[in-house]
């Protein structure tokens, strides 16, 4: 898997800030990764089928990118996870015949299919240094095409980045 957001310039800069101790000891890592491409019951992709894409759809498809990025920036590994997985679109219309990702559903024939993979996930994380984290992952958030955001809070400063404004890095200080 190509975790390409690691290489955005401001994510590289944030990683260097953490390595240089500019945030202090990392205490809290939070954020989200939201998309809308599977919002409707007529949206279909092979990732919906557990035998093809695995049982963890939203977590496996996009959540791993957020966890990789924040672990890369902080240098911290996740040691435990508590997850709340939800499937809101429990039945989808699978087109008969080939399907192209992100294409509009045609007026062709469909088959109703039960969905067991996750549309959303709420994850609580523990990191090896004792830091805590939380992330919301969704593939059913209207208007969010590919919105990844992280906030990293240390003992002296915090930093935040959002993929929808990738040329901005927020840095916060108490004073």
Stretch-by-stretch model annotation:
Residues 5-114, 169:
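Predominantly a Rossmann-like dinucleotide-binding segment in NAD(P)-dependent oxidoreductases
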Residues 106, 111-175:
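NAD(P)-dinucleotide binding in Rossmann-like oxidoreductases
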């Amino acid at each position: 898997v190509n975790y390409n957001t690691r290489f955005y310039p401001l994510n590289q800069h944030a990683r260097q800030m953490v390595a240089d101790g500019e945030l202090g000891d990392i205490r809290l890592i939070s954020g989200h990764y939201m998309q809308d491409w599977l919002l409707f019951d007529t949206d279909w992709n092979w990732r919906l089928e557990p035998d093809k894409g695995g049982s963890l759809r939203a977590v496996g498809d996009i959540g791993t990118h957020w966890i990789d990025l924040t672990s890369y920036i902080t240098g911290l590994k996740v040691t435990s996870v508590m997850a709340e997985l939800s499937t809101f679109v429990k039945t989808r219309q699978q087109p008969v015949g080939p399907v192209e990702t992100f294409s509009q559903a045609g007026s062709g024939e469909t088959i109703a299919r039960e969905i067991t993979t996750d549309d959303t996930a709420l994850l609580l994380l523990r990191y090896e240094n004792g830091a805590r984290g939380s992330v919301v992952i969704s593939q059913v958030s209207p208007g969010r095409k590919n919105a990844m955001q992280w906030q990293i809070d240390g003992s002296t400063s915090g930093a935040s980045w959002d993929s929808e404004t990738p040329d901005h890095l927020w840095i916060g200080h108490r004073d």
